């Protein structure tokens, strides 16, 4: 009996290794998620949702199929005219982060508060990791080590479901010291030294405070130092209007200089029939929606404004429009100058999906009240490592449907190397990931979307260690880093160069970068690793390896930030997005009487969190 069991185990192990080595996919990709019935406490292993109907044993003729399709379309058109759908468009906040942890397993007391609690609680957390295990032969060719992944899940769960300072640690740690956090990008870097003696300014928070949260007993996050940028600064989901008469200097700012009067936000757009994406194109417009739900925060006019003392770069491809010396805010601020406290939502978060492929690890968390609206979870993995298909490099893609809007989150670790031509290998990785990522089609309601590849989704966010380097020598790049000349560095950034040439990520967006390169640092240090090496030894040129990009309408980036943890030789990078999500409701008209066709007044007003449309198709 024991011999038979042993043979069975060996056979199962052999099959698993063959599948791993040759990247043979099972019919459904398994992933880990919380059991919905256990309120996010227990974890279960699930398979990608696939509701393909069994093929019929009787094959219909082509004429019968066409006739049936025509009848269904005619019936659907008639129903759409008789019963128009009410489409609610709501705004949800998404926290997206990527971190290469250099093969280090997290200690149980690792503090993630400064990372995950650096902003107002988001509706969705998308956290991607690379190298959660060492990329040695044992982990690449052998059985998968999921021990570190479980540790990360435990730490994330504890951090998200606890207020800052109560996650079992001594609260917020002092962030790593950063010399001269901001630079005047529009100055002449060869002769400008104004920023060298400037002090760090307490940047304003984009969180929405309320006067009801003045309780000093509520633990609050400490002010953090981060290099940050907002592609289009939104506060409470409205573009922040700026005062044209305001003129500020980069050397001294008062908190009051960045505050707005409540009357400045009394304006509302007169045409609410436009989508929020229409308003986002115009900085002067206001958008009638709040950053968070009414249940989470009380409405209050924003105190944040963007000063008008900024200049547009002539080279928009480098993403250097607004100078960081004038766009000042901090997602880590705990209160504004009026003393308003920032509450931390006590609602629980649950794990909806997590997947590991060797060192790549992607995990998605949502607020518990959203869990029932998340459907059609599907996972697809593409290996691009050894021999072109092993999982030490590659991607994990997770597809999901939130209400009626499809999302795809792609976590990648691309080919490394800083030799000339290595960027072409990374381009090839991206193309192969887009080509080979496939999701099983779901056949359920006709109204539910079931994308089968990445670009078919409504909203796509791509994160990870993309490994694109800066095409300069170590000495030249280091000199520009010390000058904080991000523009010159970005002009030599391989990703920007390849994207501008149309070789990769054509049509994709990335936020403006105003933080130093995130790779490669000496262990537990703020020094780049090349500083500790002999000049004749091989040095890693500082580079922005860790990136977040997005594709599709209805996504607005609120911030693009780097963290300062010394845990790895990479610095974590995260962005906060506002995502438009559609939810459709069918209103059945039984009669044409006045009472049946009456529209409530509330439906004509803009929602505090979105807006409403009528759709006949």
UniProtKB/Swiss-Prot annotation:
UniProt lists compositionally biased (Basic and acidic residues) regions at 254-290
- Report residue spans for region: Catalytic 1: 458-473
Q: Which UniProt keywords apply?
A: Abscisic acid signaling pathway, Differentiation, Hydrolase
InterPro entries of this UniProt entry? Endo/exonu/phosph_ase_sf, IP5P_plant, IPPc
Reactions catalysed according to its record: a 1,2-diacyl-sn-glycero-3-phospho-(1D-myo-inositol-4,5-bisphosphate) + H2O = a 1,2-diacyl-sn-glycero-3-phospho-(1D-myo-inositol 4-phosphate) + phosphate; a 1,2-diacyl-sn-glycero-3-phospho-(1D-myo-inositol-3,4,5-trisphosphate) + H2O = a 1,2-diacyl-sn-glycero-3-phospho-(1D-myo-inositol-3,4-bisphosphate) + phosphate
Gene3D superfamilies linked to this entry: Endonuclease/exonuclease/phosphatase
> Is Hydrolase tagged as a keyword?
yes
Q: Hey, what tissues is this thing expressed in?
A: Broadly expressed in emerging organs. Mostly localized in procambium of growing organs. Restricted to vascular differentiating cells of young organs.
* Extent of Low complexity compositional bias: 242-253, 291-311
- Region of interest (Disordered), residue spans: 30-62, 241-330
Pfam family of the protein (one): Exo_endo_phos2
Annotated stretches, region: Catalytic 2? 538-553
Query: What's an example of a GO molecular-function annotation for this chain?
Result: inositol trisphosphate phosphatase activity
Q: Name one GO biological process term.
A: procambium histogenesis
* Broadest EC class assigned to this enzyme: hydrolase
The EC number of this protein is 3.1.3.36, 3.1.3.86
Q: Which family does it belong to?
A: Belongs to the inositol polyphosphate 5-phosphatase family.
Cite any additional comment in the entry. Answer: CVP2 overexpression impairs protophloeme sieve element differentiation and overall root growth. Cvp1 and cvp2 double mutant displays high PtdIns(4,5)P2 levels.
What job does this protein perform?
Answer: Has phosphatase activity toward PtdIns(4,5)P2 and PtdIns(3,4,5)P3. Required for the patterning of procambium and during the differentiation of vascular tissues. Acts before the acquisition of preprocambial identity. Seems to be also involved in the abscisic acid (ABA) signaling pathway. Acts redundantly with CVL1 for maintaining vascular continuity. Regulates phosphoinositide-dependent VAN3 localization.
Can you name this protein? Type IV inositol polyphosphate 5-phosphatase 6
């Amino acid at each position: 009996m024991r011999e038979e069991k042993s043979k069975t185990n060996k056979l199962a192990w052999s099959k698993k290794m063959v599948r791993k080595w040759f990247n043979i996919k099972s019919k459904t990709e398994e992933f880990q998620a919380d059991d919905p019935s256990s309120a996010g406490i227990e974890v279960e292993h699930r398979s990608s949702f696939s509701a393909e109907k069994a093929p019929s044993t009787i094959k219909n003729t082509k004429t019968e199929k066409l006739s049936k399709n025509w009848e269904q379309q005619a019936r659907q058109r008639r129903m759409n005219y008789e019963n128009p759908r009410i489409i609610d468009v709501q705004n949800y906040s998404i926290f997206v982060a990527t971190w290469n942890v250099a093969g280090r397993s997290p200690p149980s007391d690792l503090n993630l508060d400064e990372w995950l609690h650096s902003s107002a609680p988001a509706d969705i957390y998308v956290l991607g990791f690379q190298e959660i295990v060492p990329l040695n032969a044992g982990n690449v060719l052998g059985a998968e080590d999921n021990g570190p992944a479980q540790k990360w899940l435990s730490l994330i769960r504890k951090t998200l479901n606890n207020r800052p300072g109560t996650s079992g640690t001594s609260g917020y740690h002092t962030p790593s010291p950063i010399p001269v956090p901001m630079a005047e990008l529009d100055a002449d870097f060869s002769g400008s030294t104004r920023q060298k003696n400037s002090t760090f300014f307490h940047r304003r928070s984009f969180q929405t405070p309320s006067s009801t949260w003045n309780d000093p007993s509520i633990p609050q996050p400490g002010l953090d130092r981060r290099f940050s940028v907002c592609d289009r600064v939104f506060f409470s989901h409205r573009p922040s209007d700026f005062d044209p008469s305001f003129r500020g200097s980069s050397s001294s700012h008062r908190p009051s200089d960045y505050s707005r009067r409540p009357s400045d936000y009394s304006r509302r757009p007169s045409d609410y029939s436009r989508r929020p994406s229409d308003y986002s194109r115009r900085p002067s417009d206001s958008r009638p929606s709040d950053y968070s739900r009414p249940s989470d925060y009380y409405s209050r006019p924003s105190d944040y404004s963007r000063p008008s003392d900024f200049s547009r770069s002539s080279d928009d491809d480098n993403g250097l429009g607004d100078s960081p010396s004038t766009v000042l805010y901090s997602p880590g601020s705990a209160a504004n100058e009026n003393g308003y406290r920032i509450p931390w939502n006590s609602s629980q978060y649950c794990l909806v999906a997590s997947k590991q492929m060797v060192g790549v690890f992607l995990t998605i968390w949502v607020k518990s009240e959203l869990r029932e609206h998340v459907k059609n979870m599907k996972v697809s993995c593409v290996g691009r490592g050894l021999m072109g298909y092993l999982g030490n490099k590659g991607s994990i893609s997770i597809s999901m449907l939130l209400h009626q809007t499809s999302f795809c989150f792609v976590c990648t670790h691309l080919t490394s190397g800083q030799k000339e031509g290595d960027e072409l290998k990374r381009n090839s990785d991206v193309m192969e990931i887009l080509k080979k990522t496939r999701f099983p089609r779901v056949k359920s309601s006709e109204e539910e979307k079931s994308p089968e590849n990445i670009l078919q989704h409504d909203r796509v966010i791509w994160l990870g260690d993309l490994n694109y380097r800066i095409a300069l020598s170590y000495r030249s790049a280091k000199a520009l880093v010390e000058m904080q000349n991000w523009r010159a560095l970005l002009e030599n950034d391989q990703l920007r160069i390849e994207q501008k040439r149309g070789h990769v990520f054509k049509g994709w967006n990335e936020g403006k970068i105003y933080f130093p390169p995130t790779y490669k640092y000496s262990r537990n240090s703020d020094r780049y690793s090349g500083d500790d090496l002999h000049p004749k030894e091989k040095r890693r040129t500082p580079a922005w390896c860790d990136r977040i990009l997005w594709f599709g309408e209805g996504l607005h980036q609120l911030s693009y930030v780097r963290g300062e943890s010394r845990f790895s030789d990479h610095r974590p990078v995260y962005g906060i997005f506002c995502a438009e999500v559609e939810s459709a409701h069918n209103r059945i008209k039984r009669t044409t009487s006045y009472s049946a066709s009456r529209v409530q007044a509330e439906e004509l007003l803009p929602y505090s969190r979105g807006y409403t449309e009528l759709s006949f198709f």
